[in-house]
From Swiss-Prot:
Domain ELK residues, every copy: 4-24
Record function comment: Probably binds to the DNA sequence 5'-TGAC-3'.
SMART domains, per database record: ELK (SM01188), HOX (SM00389)
Protein name: Homeobox protein knotted-1-like 3
Gene3D superfamilies named in the record: Homeodomain-like
Predominant subcellular localization, coarse grouping: nucleus
A GO molecular-function descriptor: DNA-binding transcription factor activity, RNA polymerase II-specific
Entry GO CC: nucleus
Provenance organism: Zea mays
Amino acid sequence: DDKELKKQLLRKYSGCLGNLRKELCKKRKKDKLPKEARQKLLSWWELHYRWPYPSEMEKIALAESTGLEQKQINNWFINQRKRHWKPS
């Protein structure tokens, strides 16, 4: 019967489900960058809109001034170009 099967499955997999919930909660918290960091990145973006590809040195400087990792800087620019840039 369905109720018995449900009970068995819950008994067998409840630990896994709990771990999955914890993992999902951890990952959800990482979605937004701090407001100040976003503002600094957007300022750079606006100044360089025609060619929004920071050099490695500029990425290092942005990482230091925002407190973000360089990978986060790279990902932000990739996403920003994909979503908002219309090359002229």
